[in-house]
Amino acid sequence: IGLLIEGHVQYQFMTITEIEKFYAAFYPGQWKKEAYYELMNKLKVVTRQRISRMSCGQRSQVALGLILAQNPELLVLDDFSLGLDPGYRRLFVDYLRDYARSEGKTVFLTSHIIQDMERLVDDCIIMDYGKILIQKPIAELLEKGRRYTFTIPEGYELPASDDFYHPSIMRNQLETFSFLQPAETE
C-alpha cells in the first residue's frame, strides 16, 4: 500500500535525487526509480533542487513520486492535488490515470475538486462525516445527479432534509445537489 496524506513528512534538506536514493534503500527489489523520475520530468521538477525551496504542490508531487516508485498494488491518496495550480493539476491527473491503467493499479483517492474526479474514477463514494451517502459508478452519478439553485428570502431558516447533500448558502442563494430524479420527488 502506498499512502499519501495531507501534511506528509519529507526531509527538507535533501534534493530530489538525494531523497530518491534514500527511499530506494528501504525497497530493495521492488523500487521503480524510473516511475519517480518520469513524474519529476513530466512536472518539470529540477532534480538538483532542495525540497525546502519547493512549493507545497511540488512537495506533494515529490511525495507521490516516491510512492509510485515503491510499486504498491494499492495507492491511497488523500487530497493528492493539494497546492497544485490548475495547469499542473490537470497534467498530473492525466499522468495518474494513465499510470494506474498501464500498471494495473488500484487507486483510492479523496479530492474536493469534482472535475478531477470525473476524469479519474470509475466508481464514486460520497461521504459526510464518515457516513456513506451514495456509492455508485461515476457515469450513473453524472447522469442522475441534479444541481439546484434557489433564492432564499432574508431571514428564512431551511429545514434539514436527507434529499439534499452539502447545501451552502451565499448571498441568499442555496446551491444543492440531489440524486433523486424529479419524478421520484413528487
State what each model feature region is.
Residues 82-84:
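ABC ATPase nucleotide-binding domain "signature" loop
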Residues 71:
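Conserved catalytic motifs of ABC-family nucleotide-binding domains
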Residues 3-62:
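ABC-family P-loop ATPase nucleotide-binding domains
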Residues 91-179:
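ABC transporter nucleotide-binding domain
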Residues 50-52, 80, 137:
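Conserved structural locus in ABC ATPase nucleotide-binding domains
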Residues 86-88:
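Helix N-cap at the start of a conserved alpha-helix in ABC-type nucleotide-binding domains
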Residues 75-79:
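Catalytic Walker B motif of ABC-type/P-loop ATPase nucleotide-binding domains
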